[in-house]
């Protein structure tokens, strides 16, 4: 299914469709080619971090909150922070030099990363072959001494763990040099 078919399918379904299983499989194959080992747990479909936490609170490492944002200039950002991190968009906008930073509409998310709201993940960046999405990472994720970073594997009915070093290598392989910011 190409990007336009996915956008059309989600539109026709009234937004009820979730990222197809084949995208998760595609991600897993990509990670395997990079020799990146992950852990994965299945859970009911969740749409917020609050809904997800009862299913993942037992995992060692850090759980992410992921936001797909755009600015006034139509630049797009995938912001990944620790799950309980408060995020002030005005301050983030200033730090990134991104005027009027706000949540991007789901259609743009589907066009760029082929996932729906509730499924946003840094792992979707392997599909951004145009490299039009800027990855922004909370320094706590990569330099906080965590064994794993937990995020969705293209679907909001599972959570995947990846080491901080492997996430950085994944981003390097997808040619997404992350902007790493301290939010403390």
Swiss-Prot record:
GO molecular function: aminoacyl-tRNA deacylase activity
Pfam families: tRNA_edit
The protein's name in its UniProt record: Prolyl-tRNA synthetase associated domain-containing protein 1
InterPro entries per record: ProX/PRXD1, YbaK/aa-tRNA-synt-asso_dom_sf, YbaK/aa-tRNA-synth-assoc-dom
Family per similarity comment: Belongs to the PRORSD1 family.
Residue ranges crossing the lipid bilayer per the database entry: none
Domain of life: Eukaryota
Native source organism of the sequence: Danio rerio (Zebrafish)
Disulfide bonds: none
Coiled-coil segments on the chain, per record: none
């Amino acid at each position: 299914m190409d990007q336009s078919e996915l956008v059309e399918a989600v539109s026709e379904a009234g937004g009820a469709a979730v990222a197809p299983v084949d995208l998760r499989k595609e991600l897993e194959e990509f990670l395997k080619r990079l020799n990146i080992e992950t852990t994965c747990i299945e859970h009911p479909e969740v749409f917020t971090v609050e809904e997800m936490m009862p299913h993942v609170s037992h995992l060692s490492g850090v759980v992410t909150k992921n936001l797909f944002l755009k600015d006034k200039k139509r630049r797009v950002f995938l912001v990944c922070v620790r799950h309980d991190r408060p995020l002030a968009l005005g301050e983030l906008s200033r730090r990134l030099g991104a005027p009027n930073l706000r949540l991007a509409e789901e259609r743009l998310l589907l066009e760029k990363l082929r996932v729906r709201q509730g499924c946003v993940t840094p792992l979707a960046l392997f599909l951004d072959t145009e490299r039009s999405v800027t990855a922004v990472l909370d320094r706590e994720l990569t330099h906080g001494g965590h064994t794993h970073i937990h995020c969705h594997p293209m679907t909001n009915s599972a959570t995947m763990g990846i080491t901080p070093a492997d996430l950085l290598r994944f981003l390097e392989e997808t040619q997404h040099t992350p902007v790493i910011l301290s939010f403390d």
